[in-house]
Design a protein with these regions (language model features):
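Residue-level signal for inorganic ion chemistry
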Residues: 1, 69, 148
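Short, intrinsically disordered, charge-balanced linker/junction segments flanking boundaries
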Residues: 2-4, 55, 171-174
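Histidine-rich, glycine-flanked metal-binding segment
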Residues: 1-25
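Metal-associated gating/positioning segment near the N- to mid-region
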Residues: 22-94, 110-113
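Metal-coordinating catalytic core of metallo-dependent amide/deamination hydrolases
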Residues: 94-174
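N-terminal Rossmann-like NAD(P) cofactor-binding module of classical short-chain dehydrogenase/reductase
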Residues: 17, 30, 153
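Flexible, active-site-proximal loop/turn residues at the rims of small-molecule/cofactor binding pockets
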Residues: 10, 79, 158
Length: 174
């Protein structure tokens, strides 16, 4: 929507929509999404997907989100900066989707909400930067900013998606 009103100059070639008798509203904003997710509540399922498939979930979800009326989303974490790459592709016009703000990788303590360690000893931390203490946390913040993060997401408590840290467990202190 460029302009709304009763009278104004319309540039030649512009599309004019007569919305008389209708309600016109701005696009919606979703403030907490994981755009590259396949929607499975078990986040560990993504461990079985090749990186390209995770990126394609992001592109697919971006189109569906825009088609649903959301013109901006705040992604809250995706593996390896995929949401930041998707954001750039949308800005360049090579992908369709809403405007995206994204944090890069989530910052979590060892064993914390975004530490995707598996009891077999395998660790999948493409989605997070494990940071214990202020020095490591500052370094992780700098890495995210270097990679283009719009904001920093730090898991300060446990969460509902992680098996070993209840939601009321403090994980960082000031």
């Amino acid at each position: 929507i460029e302009e709304v009103g009763k009278t104004f100059d319309v540039p030649s070639g512009a599309t004019v929509i007569d919305a008389g008798g209708k309600t016109v509203m701005p696009g919606l904003i979703d403030a907490h999404v994981h755009v590259c997710s396949n929607g499975d509540p078990n986040v560990m399922t993504m461990l079985t997907f090749p990186p390209g498939l995770i990126q394609l979930f992001g592109a697919y979800n971006a189109v569906k989100t825009l088609d649903a009326g959301y013109t901006m989303i705040r992604d809250m974490g995706a593996p390896s900066g995929y949401a930041l790459s998707l954001k750039k592709a949308i800005e360049m016009g090579i992908a369709k989707g809403p405007r995206i703000i994204a944090p890069g990788r989530i910052i979590s303590m060892t064993g914390g909400h975004a530490d995707f360690y598996i009891p077999s000893g395998v660790s999948y931390n493409e989605m997070s930067l494990i940071s214990d203490g202020p020095i490591e946390t500052r370094r992780s913040t700098r890495i995210n900013l270097r990679e283009g993060a719009d904001f920093i997401k730090i898991c300060t408590t446990g969460g509902v998606m992680s098996p070993t840290d209840p939601v009321d467990t403090p994980q960082y202190t000031v």
